[in-house]
Amino acid sequence: EAGGIDAIIEVTGAIEFGAQVVIRAIEHSKHIILMNAEIDGTVGPILKVYADRAGVIVSGCDGDQPGVEMNLYRFVRGIGLRPLVCGNIKGLQDPYRTPTTQAGFAAKWGQNPTMVTSFADGTKISFEQAIVANATGMKVSRRGMNGWNFTDHVDDLTKKYAIEELE
């Protein structure tokens, strides 16, 4: 509500509270920068409708996923090519991580065990890829994404895709 504030950066990682903050900010003509993949992946398209109606911008951030991925997508389009795949290479992913298995790490770094688990079990990357799909109109190739265990050179990943399925 405060005058003199043009934009709000939402970074809580909480869906319900963060969405309430964003909606309230939009109601008061504040631009929004989302650094909260959980909000963007669940209600981001809805928030965009509210922002458009209010004449403000709702945007993701740069410097991390999915912002870096979106920059690559825009670059490829900008040089006249049509991107067929947007993906994210995850160095550590273990679908069996739980808040219990992550409790020690979370305590050591002063973080929430549930949030830390989402970084390791694939939850966070799923939100990030949903955001990219929403923003680009691309489709998620399959429920749960692909998640190949791949240790060769990144250029060889192209052999994993059937071009006709991507078009």
Task: For each feature predicted by the language model, list its residue ranges.
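Conserved N-terminal Rossmann-fold NAD(P) cofactor-binding segment
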Residues: 1-2
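N-terminal Rossmann-like NAD(P) cofactor-binding module of classical short-chain dehydrogenase/reductase
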Residues: 6-10
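Rossmann-fold NAD(P)-binding glycine/threonine-rich loop
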Residues: 12-28, 35-64, 72-75
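Amphipathic alpha-helical transducer elements in NTP-driven molecular machines
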Residues: 66-69, 126
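Active-site-lining helix/loop region of Rossmann-like oxidoreductase modules
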Residues: 74, 79-167
